[in-house]
Amino acid sequence: MKFCRGWRGARAGQFARLLCVCWCSLGACSCVRESTERSGVVPISPSSQQKVLFVFGKKYSGHVYLVDCVERVCEAWRMRARVVEYGDLTRLSALPRMKVVLEAVHEMRPDAVVSLGLPVGGGKYLLAVKRERAQTLIVSLLPEEEVLPMQAGSDILVDFQVKEDSLEGVAEVSNTEAELQSLLRAACEIVRRRGVARRAHASPLQEFRGAFANVTDSLREQGVFSSDYAMECYVDPETGVRAYNHVLLSKRVETFRFVRSYGGSPGRSVHERDRM
């Protein structure tokens, strides 16, 4: 009987310790839950809340592979996307109505605007977006608009540098599908990172370089992308002023055809040469 009482006492002690452990665990969970409620933290990825407006200029509209690229990337990162193409800009007039972009921003209230080949006259509307919605990230790729309006209206402006030994009189740029998709994916990567970090932790040049490297490295592993690029900030040929948010790309691997020969002084961007 003494053995039984001792055994029962031991079991009772174990049960008491188990209750104590459970009570402490519940208390810790409630403290974590209370702390989460106080801080306003919601266990949902910020990228799932991001809305992105894409604007395609004349040269890049009507290409299914670009729209498919946007849809795949935004679906993978749970972004809501809307694409405004050149046909949407010219639906009511022969010339593009760039005000359509501003109207789309008012309607969608996007976290970011990504343009590819923005037509002439679009820069002032991007600047209007920045004035009305300073928190909206604007990434501009290969614009046809003048340099200064694009620099003023963009957080990150990306163009291709033209080499000094280019030929005069050629006014076209040859882009591959892989290159255009890489630019779009890099822009989306920047949008995603900004959504997580809430603000930039690097310069526009560093930010784009990192995003573009991630994209191209992934494509190289798939055997899709083979070119290598150097990047630098745009320098105004007349004043010598370096643009903080204007990134110029130039190929290190010349065998990969991308930019045809252009004339003019070195350091000027492709869309400047188009107007020469």
UniProtKB/Swiss-Prot annotation:
Disulphide bonds in the chain: none
Lipidation (S-diacylglycerol cysteine): C29
Membrane topology: Lipid-anchor
Signal peptide bounds: 1-28
GO cellular component: plasma membrane
Keyword Lipoprotein in annotation: yes
Subcellular localization(s) per the UniProt record: Cell membrane
Keyword entries, A-Z: Cell membrane, Lipoprotein, Membrane, Palmitate, Signal
Lipid attachment points (N-palmitoyl cysteine): C29
Keyword Nucleotidyltransferase: no
Record protein name field: Uncharacterized lipoprotein TP_0938
Organism: Treponema pallidum (strain Nichols)
